[in-house]
Regions:
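Outer-membrane beta-barrel translocator domains and adjoining extracellular loop/strand segments
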Residues: 97-100, 157-163, 185-192, 230-238, ...
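Outer-membrane beta-barrel "beta-signal"
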Residues: 28-29, 293, 392-394, 418-424
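Detector for outer-membrane/organellar transmembrane beta-barrel domains
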Residues: 253-380
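Residues that define the transmembrane beta-barrel architecture of outer-membrane proteins
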Residues: 79, 120-129, 159-163, 168, ...
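N-terminal periplasmic/intermembrane-space "pro-region" immediately following the signal or transit peptide
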Residues: 23-95
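Transmembrane beta-strand segments that form the barrel wall of outer-membrane beta-barrel proteins
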Residues: 143-155, 219-226, 263-268, 356-365, ...
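Short, small-residue-biased leader/transition segments that mark boundaries at the very start
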Residues: 1-7
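Outer membrane beta-barrel
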Residues: 74-103, 114-228, 247, 251-254, ...
Length: 424
């Protein structure tokens, strides 16, 4: 059927990753006697303003889908609804050590002799295949606006799970999306869906504002829904939170592919003590510096550095370990925030318009305070992540890639484990 043909054309079948950008070619004025009618048009026939808003990827990362090829638009070309997505299939082979996840987290490299003695592992994954709806438009009072929802199949039992649902207008973002203590455009390309273990990555419900009225500058503030992942025991529990998280950022751009961004976040984390029969709060904070820039026309650099206390939920590797707040061994019935950091540095080289290669090294580190971890010296202290990959844009709708990953996990006991993975 025609509907089936349209659906097939707007989906991407990929091995490893995603669709490529398609840009507007020219503006076509569509005449219609019915003022409230809508039309199904290809992207190059929509208005220039609609295409510009639809193609904006300033708040998306490498793994996110691009604008759909076909749109539903009103006859004046001021509003458009895109329905699209992609199918993403990966094959993974671990050797000389495994990671207990389809994503490559060094924190999840299992301890030797922990019940699984296999050193090799084969997996396939299609759960990051994505569907989305994107409504864009331009009005007199709201200016450019976007309503975006997207999801993949990472829910329980590979069910559909919401990944983004937000509205943007006049610089405001309201809804569920990537957190403000991130820099999406500074993330390097990877087939691995998690990416560098020392990068900041999380999603949250938020009210944020971004000002870009000054040339080359962006300023942002946000209020975010708190989510605290801590280590508890019989005397300590984490339940109700009393304060939102607050984040701020400033970014300077000197061309469309180069910027430096500084960010900060502060959070108050509430826990209850059965020993004192009272609720307490521990304060966490994070500082971030990130960048991406052109070294030459074919060479791009990526980098990020994060440091703080109680920000484990925001950092890729540490988000698996419940270390936002942990028991204080020196103070019974109390919890503490630990210092932690994460960073990465990477390069991408474009061999030709359709082929590029990249490599990234990343590190995540958790520090000890007040005797932590006194009861478990095999707790995570440091993780390292190394990735090298190559991508080929076979066509405007198909991209394939191959990737090598190596990870190391070092515990407070100084014991180290490692794993290797091939992705394609």
């Amino acid at each position: 059927s025609a509907a089936s043909d349209v659906y097939k054309r707007q989906m991407l079948l990929g091995i490893g990753i995603f669709p490529l950008c398609a840009y507007a070619q020219q503006k076509v004025v569509i005449e219609d006697e019915e003022p409230n009618s809508i039309m199904f048009v290809s992207k190059n026939k929509a208005g220039d303003e609609i295409i510009r808003i639809m193609n904006d990827r300033s708040q998306m990362r490498f793994h996110d889908p691009n604008a759909p090829r076909f749109l539903l638009t009103d006859q004046k070309g001021k509003f458009a609804l895109g329905i699209g997505g992609y199918v993403r299939a990966t094959a993974e082979y671990d050797f000389n050590g495994i990671v207990n996840d389809v994503d490559f987290y060094p924190a999840l490299i299992p301890q030797r002799g922990s019940g699984n003695f296999a050193k090799n592992q084969f997996q396939m994954d299609i759960t990051t295949s994505t569907l989305f709806l994107k409504l864009v438009g331009r009005t007199k009072h709201l200016g450019d606006f976007v309503v975006y929802t997207a999801g993949n199949f990472r829910g329980d039992g590979k069910t559909f799970e919401l990944q983004n649902a937000y509205a943007q207008f006049l610089g405001f973002t309201i809804g569920y999306s990537y957190g403000s203590f991130m820099d999406l455009s500074a993330l390097p390309p990877t087939i691995d869906f998690a990416g560098p273990n020392g990068s900041a990555f999380y999603r949250t419900t938020q009210l944020s504002y971004m000002c870009d009225k000054l040339k080359n500058w962006k300023f942002g503030v946000s209020m975010e829904m708190p989510s605290v992942d801590g280590t508890t025991n019989n005397d300590l529990s984490i339940n109700t939170q009393r304060m939102p998280d607050f984040a701020t950022s400033v970014q300077y751009n000197w061309n469309s592919s180069s910027h430096v961004k500084l960010g900060a976040i502060v959070r108050s984390m509430t826990y209850s003590s059965n020993v004192h029969e009272k609720a307490y709060s521990a304060t966490g904070f994070g500082l971030q510096a990130s960048t991406t820039f052109n070294i030459t026309k074919k060479l791009q650099a990526f980098g990020q550095f994060n440091y703080g206390k109680g920000i484990g939920s925001y950092l890729n590797d540490l988000s698996n370990l419940n270390v936002d707040i942990v028991p204080d061994p020196d103070n019974e019935g109390k919890m503490q925030v630990l210092p932690m950091l994460g960073w990465y540095a990477g390069l991408q080289y474009n061999l030709c318009p359709s082929i590029f290669i990249s490599g990234t090294y990343s590190l995540s580190r958790l520090y000890s305070e007040n005797g932590y971890p006194s009861e478990n010296p095999e707790s995570y202290r440091k993780g390292q992540y190394l990735v090298a990959n190559a991508f080929w844009n076979v066509s405007s709708n198909l991209q394939v890639g191959v990737e090598y990953l190596r990870g190391w996990r070092t515990d407070f006991s100084s014991a180290t484990r490692h794993a290797n993975r091939l992705n394609m």
